[in-house]
Curated annotation (Swiss-Prot):
Zn(2+) binds at H154, C169, H172, C175. This is Fructokinase. ATP binds at T131, P183, G231, V232, M233, N234, Q235. InterPro entries: ATPase_NBD (IPR043129), Carb_Metab_Reg_Kinase/Isom (IPR051804), ROK (IPR000600), ROK_cs (IPR049874). It holds the Pfam family ROK. The lineage of its organism: Bacteria, Bacillati, Bacillota, Bacilli, Lactobacillales. Belongs to the ROK (NagC/XylR) family. Its cofactor is Mg(2+).
Length: 288
């Protein structure tokens, strides 16, 4: 049995084949240009690398409710040309195999939950903080969706005194993505993340907002583990700062696991999404 995975990002698509244990046997990276160009390359890949099922995680917003007429679509994305694109419908027209459709962060969350750092617990949250902020919630080893998928990067926070930075989010003045995602860090400092010193005064601000978000996730979902990934979180010195501020904000109200095991980096690194896609392909095949 050979399984397929698609990690569809706003900059690039990663397509891969692999096994039911999430191990990748082959992969390719495709630039995200137009739907016609990018999807033609996706079709070509899986035509020359035939698989039994494909797990797809896409940038969004997307339609994830099977009862929604827009199920399978990329909906209101600002990505030029991709708004109202029937992603799942296109793949169904090309491949007569089981398909699993979800968000890119849900895909990564599932990978970490099944074979990554959260494999020993049933409830976890995976949050990526990079170009944007997105999060996937795993509840009792299943992906959590409500009316639609979560948009936890846009949770409202308390602005720090003296922080007069204009939010980078066009919709919200004090959301996590607007204040602490990679572009916000860049605008605050005028530097690329890799060029910002570990002792730069921006990091206490960024870690405070991430800690606030982790408290919100804790009281809302009661996870066993919060996994932080993405370009901003490549700065490993941020984790102790986040844990310290998290403990201060939670203030002993709720018992949580030891913080070194509770707020953690991804176990699969940049492979979380593709591994999750392979595992979701396996689930789609079993449910077919």
């Amino acid at each position: 049995m050979l399984l397929g995975a698609i990690e569809a990002g706003g900059t690039k698509f990663v397509c891969a084949t692999g096994a039911e244990n999430g191990q990748v046997s082959d992969r390719i990276s495709i630039p995200t240009t137009t739907p016609v160009e990018t999807m033609t390359a996706v079709d070509d890949y899986f035509t020359t690398h035939p698989v039994d099922a494909i797990g797809i995680g896409s940038f969004g917003p997307i339609g994830v409710n099977p009862h929604d007429p827009k199920y399978g679509y990329i909906t209101t994305t600002p990505k030029p040309g991709w708004g109202d694109f029937d992603f799942l419908g296109h793949l169904k027209s090309q491949f007569n195999i089981p398909l699993y459709w979800t968000t890119d962060v849900n895909e990564a969350a599932y990978g970490e939950s099944m074979i990554g750092i959260a494999k020993d617990v049933p409830n976890s949250i995976y949050m990526t903080i990079g170009t944007g902020v997105g999060a996937g919630v795993i509840s009792q080893n299943h992906i959590f969706n409500g009316r639609t998928h979560t948009e936890l990067g846009h949770m409202r926070l308390n602005r720090l005194p003296g922080d007069d930075f204009k939010s980078n989010c066009p919709y919200h003045d004090i959301c996590l993505e607007g204040l602490a995602a990679g572009p916000a860090v860049g605008k605050r400092t005028g530097k690329a993340g890799k060029d910002i010193p570990v002792d730069d005064p921006v990091w206490p601000i960024i870690t405070d907002y991430i800690a606030q978000a982790c408290v919100n996730l804790t009281v809302a979902f009661a996870p066993d583990k919060i996994i932080l990934n993405g370009g901003v979180m490549n700065q490993r010195q941020l984790f102790p700062m986040i844990r310290e501020k998290f403990a201060a904000y939670l203030n002993g109200y709720e018992e949580v696991p030891p913080l070194d095991d509770y707020i953690v980096p991804a176990g699969l690194g940049n492979n979380s999404g593709i591994a999750g896609g392979l595992l979701l392909a396996q689930a789609a095949l079993k449910n077919a």
